[in-house]
């Protein structure tokens, strides 16, 4: 297996170090659109709950959960929220806004605001990353030291959502296409 996969190591490293061009204007507009969703949903959630409610706070969500009737729940994950939302239409509305807020926050924080290397989104491919011989990906191994923390460039390419792919553009003489889904 190693002998067969070793030939993939060079292309994996090269692809990760080359990355892909990002259209800065498109990235900014996508990020701004998601920023509007974040602020709109936060205002809506805070109107439906209390003014200092933080959708990312486990404590706040757990308190809300108990207020809405989820007293015996052990956690507040998506499945638990869906279960409570089926019983309580008010909970359904509030959790819908919380989920929209979290989805937009994840999109902005993980993909749209990922640190770029110049104008390029980098990643690291691992040809040995799965048992099924498929490649896995992660943030690039290139980083900057900022005070006491490392800032890695890019994002993992494997789960890049279609919305975030709109900011990518091919280099001159190349095309972008996707063979999965």
Where are these regions (language model features)?
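Conserved "right-hand" nucleotidyltransferase catalytic core of DNA-directed polymerases
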Residues: 1-164, 169-175, 181
